[in-house]
């Protein structure tokens, strides 16, 4: 049994997690923006890592979802290989993807089709979750199977239960703005075990935390104007929170990933931050973030058309 001091020591060590500064390209990175081959990506956005370290990618400009298995040289198309439209087998501008374990299905946000769909890969059918008056971006799902959807142009996040027609407002919805009860183009989101919702408030250059049933959020990263100091963010995108409550955010226009601890005035650069570029220690508009079960960090390096893996330093 661990003593209190040992537990604290372990937590302190975890808080000091470092990552290799030179990323490994694990998907894409084989050509220009218009690359449609199976070894290419075009402006990847949301990602998630399966238990077997397969990477699922919203390959946005190729209008498809692709799966890259561990150590694979190319991906396989999971959804959307039939052109960009709104039919069952088509996608148009997929931005994020999550997996619903209870229903063994993927949840996909499609910006240009203004819909979120539940996609069953085995029989290649889908069900529409939202109505057509949304502009869906980031997705999250809780242990009850409720789906959270960031609506970038309605400046709100809604929670959708099975059969909902409009969803339930859980954050924002008070017009576009920078007050604590407002959002300004929310992009990616993360739901914690206590149902606190973390939102990349893109045009306010901050990450907001909305506790369950809260009427307003609190700033947990950024919020000091647009900039590149350690107190600032510049159009945040992907956001994930670890088991210690540390917030990892893709600081997109600063081409870096930052880590913030709630209550602290500034964050720290975890990877990137070496200028816009395509070297292994550089990023170019990072988007989605995800961890594997070993704690390695994956970044959708969108304008380099690749997924970068930054290994944890043990």
Q: Which positions does each model-derived feature cover?
A:
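Hydrophobic/aromatic beta-strand positions that recur at structurally equivalent sites within the blades
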Residues: 68, 99, 116-120, 160, ...
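Short loop/turn segments immediately following the C-termini of beta-strands
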Residues: 52, 60, 102, 111, ...
